[in-house]
Amino acid sequence: MSDDPVTRIVSPVERLRVEVLARIDRLESVSRGSPDLLPARVVAHVQDVGDVEGNLGDWLGERGSGRWIEGFRITPPQDVTPAELLYRVVVGPGQLSLWTPSGRFCGSEGLAQPLRGFCVRLQGAAAENYECSYAATFVDGSVAGLIPGGQLCAAATFAPLEAFQITLRPRAR
């Protein structure tokens, strides 16, 4: 190891950066080109950008941008009712929103406040027929990957959510 104090600091930081990028690459390779993803519209409101749209399975927000997500809305697939696909967001440590039925916005509409995490759950027929998972990146470089539906997705530091991906797949029978 070098005696240079800058090298002693930069080397661990660079190793961490490489590890984070490798995790993101693994997340992308798992979700890329999966023909069994169930399509549905997702709209996210991004700091200083506005609304961005995509489908379930797409990444929303820009990884590495430093811009946080302020809220989102999922329009469910045709065979899933709004009451069967619910989501909630983390607005701060120990501060969770109420469960929001799909089709409705969840977040800090008009307040420019960052989300610090989220959770998606299925119930009823949707839970019997589909499985949900998600991944996210945060403005501090934290990565959360392949979280099963119903579990909280947040950085240990409660850093603002920067980008996320939600997938919905038919259950294997």
Where are these regions (language model features)?
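Lectin-type carbohydrate-recognition ectodomains
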Residues: M1-R173
